[in-house]
Amino acid sequence: MADYQEYRRRILHRRWRRMFIIVALLALVALLSAIGILWKVLHRERVDTALSQNTILRQVTTDNTWNTVNYPLARQLRVQTLEDSTETALDFRMAALPASAPVEKSWFAQVSFVGDSLTQGMQIYDTGLPGAQFCAYKGVGPNAFVNGTSCKRADGVTEIPLDALTAQQPKAVYVLLGSNVLGRDTDYTSFLTYYRLMLDMISQALPDAKIYVQSITPVRPEVGTQANHAGLNRDRLCRINNELAAIALEKNCYFLNLWEVLADENGDLIESYAQPDGYHIKPEGYAAWVDYLCSHTME
């Protein structure tokens, strides 16, 4: 009898232990389910909040529009659906500042241009804006601006870009950087990060100045086939310009779509505007560029 009682005690103990484990598992499943439901609710709230802010990549909105720009547009902003993705990117062509009453070239006497050799052309050619102020340096990107690198101007003088720009005290700043650092077909995340930081630094140094972000200019189709310029192809430049347009809106800057006047029907740099290298621009191209700038201001 004692053996039976011991055996029964062991069986009951095992049964109760098994039942305890089952109950504990059920409780754990219920807890995890509750946590999952709570996470979904909170996550949905964060997504909804994000959709009300300026973001570079965003879920499709109910009417497929994006109306967060700080200036009037000729048409509603639409977004592009990214291939094999539910996310979308802002179309830089739709985010551009619309045409305005043209200003005289003399208006740019109180304006500064920040850029690389493409901007130096604006300074050097008579068809550009030689009467404006410039912080233009061959071969630079936004990282040189952020890091306070000493840069050499077209006349050979070396200076720190932000210091030089601040000393000019312009009423507006026009920025065009990217062609020199995007030639390699690599990830451009760091370029965008530096670009954001650069705009922040300009805004802090010149709080009253309006900032115009110019799109990276188009190139001839053969440029992207060259090993040292594989990243300068039409499709990639469009994606980067989408990002720059979103950054401009995020930073309360104005975005200018230079492709309106420099690109042909295929989205390539107009052949008659192209220098032999396929991405630098001839004087007649600068004339069209200047006409566009004169008719796209916030004055």
Regions from the language model: what does each represent?
Residues 101-193:
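Conserved SGNH/GDSL esterase-like catalytic core that processes O-acyl groups on lipids
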Residues 195-199, 241:
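Generic structural signal for well-ordered alpha-helices
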Residues 148-152, 180-189, 202, 227-234, ...:
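Second-shell loop/turn segments in exported
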Residues 219-299:
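Catalytic His-Asp segment of secreted/periplasmic serine-dependent ester chemistry enzymes
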Residues 206-210:
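A short helix->loop->beta-strand "cap" motif at the edges of active sites that frequently abuts
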Residues 1-110, 119, 123-124:
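N-terminal secretory targeting modules
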